[in-house]
């Protein structure tokens, strides 16, 4: 419907909030959209890359659970850590769950890589 068209137009113009809404729309088949996980991930990535913690959290959770996407604990840890740093309170519990099931060396490697990325971006 009309709301879907407006959100998609705003998302295409680069609004992170609209990109997150469009991602959610496809993830849960809202506003008359057909459920499309690949499309949801595409829009979540656009919003997450702009630093939106809710999109980073959504991506991390999807990757952690492997629902509609290949489960990837390393990528999930990266997105959830970014979401946490950017203010997502909910990310912490999911990070704790990942820490329990991941190899400590893998977690250290991810944290080192994220620190390097932050230094090169800063």
Q: Where does each model-flagged region fall?
A:
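Structural signature of tandem alpha-helical TPR/SEL1-like repeats
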Residues: 1-6, 33-43, 70-78, 109
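Terminal, low-structured helical/coil segments at or just beyond the last alpha-helical repeat
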Residues: 86-122
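Alpha-helical, heptad-rich or low-complexity scaffold/stalk segments
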Residues: 61, 75, 82, 97-99, ...
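Short helix-capping/linker turns of helical repeat alpha-solenoids
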Residues: 7, 12-16, 28-30, 49-52, ...
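Hydrophobic face of amphipathic alpha-helices that form TPR/SEL1-like repeat modules
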Residues: 6, 21-29, 33, 58-65, ...
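TPR/TPR-like alpha-solenoid signature
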Residues: 20, 57, 77-78, 93
């Amino acid at each position: 419907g009309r709301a879907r068209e407006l959100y998609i137009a705003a998302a295409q113009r680069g609004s992170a909030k609209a990109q997150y809404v469009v991602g959610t729309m496809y993830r849960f088949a809202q506003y008359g959209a057909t459920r499309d996980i690949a499309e949801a991930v595409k829009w979540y990535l656009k919003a997450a890359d702009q630093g939106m913690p809710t999109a980073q959290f959504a991506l991390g959770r999807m990757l952690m659970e492997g629902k509609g996407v290949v489960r990837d604990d390393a990528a999930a840890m990266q997105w959830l850590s970014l979401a946490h740093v950017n203010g997502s309170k909910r990310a912490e519990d999911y990070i704790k769950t990942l820490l329990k099931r991941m190899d400590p060396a893998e977690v250290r490697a991810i944290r080192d890589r994220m620190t390097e990325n932050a230094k090169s971006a800063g």
